[in-house]
Amino acid sequence: MVVGFLGTNSIQISSKRILCPVSGFDSYGTISIEDNHISALSKREAATSSDALPDSAFVLPGIIDLHCHVGSHQSIYGVDPVRILKSGTTVACSQGDAGAATIDQYVAEVIAVAPLYVKLAINLSSIGESTEEGCFSLSEWIDVAACIDAIDRHRDSVWAVSVNTSHHACPELDPRSLLKAGLKVAAETGLPILYGMRRPEDWSLADQLALLRPGDVVTYCFRKTPHCIVENGRVLECVLDARVRGVLFDVGHGCGSFDFDVAESAVRCGFLPDTISTDLQTGHVTNNILHDLPLVMSKLRAVGMQELDIFRAVTETPAKIINEPKRGSLCAGSIADLTVLMESESACQLTDTNGNMRCGKVWTGRQLGS
């Protein structure tokens, strides 16, 4: 790779491979940057001896993690944003780390000062993820009007309303009432829902999905238990119907929400996740578990998802979902967020959250310039 500084605000970056899912560009190339925005993307005939990166390295639009936990002091699940940036992720979307009662502090102490771009799926629970108890343990933590007001105060920082109806999040409250309240907030504010499913013995998955709207996002889509979108190797009809209606599906790997068998069955059936995300949280840090977005991308490749679909699921698609049209692309006018990915020379052992194994080459990433 060659980085040329043409002036105070002008840079040219050349690499053996530059890839942009939006434009279809995949070639030797040069990215021209003016005032932190891309001014041009052009092909080169061949690599040169001055290209410093190995052959396996290439440049993508800055990758976007649609579901993670950001902010090491503001949420019990939150991770230092510096850790996220080091893996090459340039946009981190917090899943419910702040609610109406905590969003002002979260914006000031995380979003405003983080070294990468952070957007929030505001928690329907006013306390966010600030307690070891489930965020919907008490009914008084659900305040539709307060949530709407918080979104209005921080419209530029909020991309969705987070409604996690899992048994852990709401052990006593009726999950139907939670989703109803979340949908009211979403309708009033024009935002999508980021939805965590309830176990089917409490509420059928078909009935849950039927309430979601086009543009709403279901996370933890490749979990095996207590809910699963696959049965006997086939994707459930209610899940396929939801996708036809425009409901979106996100990986949300986490500490217990990614199963190779489920993912492999879904991919084999042509059911690809719309977005790939880590659900990175303190459990990964405290247990010294290597976990980042390029690694989760590698796991999707190991179950048969094609590279271009993977790259799109961490750039173009999440940028659209969070309403950031100048991100996730290398087209002229886009913000100059860039990620460098490098591929391992040989296959490595990959593990899902249930201890199952697959083998595959692994991507590692860094932000360009880091």
Model-predicted segments: where are they?
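Divalent-metal coordination cores built from histidine and acidic residues
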Residues: 82-167
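Active-site core of metal-dependent hydrolases
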Residues: 165-266, 270-287
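Divalent metal-coordination and catalytic microenvironments
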Residues: 16, 36, 56, 67, ...
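C-terminal cap of metal-dependent C-N hydrolases
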Residues: 335-370
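Hydrophobic faces of well-ordered beta-strands that scaffold small-molecule active sites
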Residues: 64-68, 92-94, 118-122, 159-163, ...
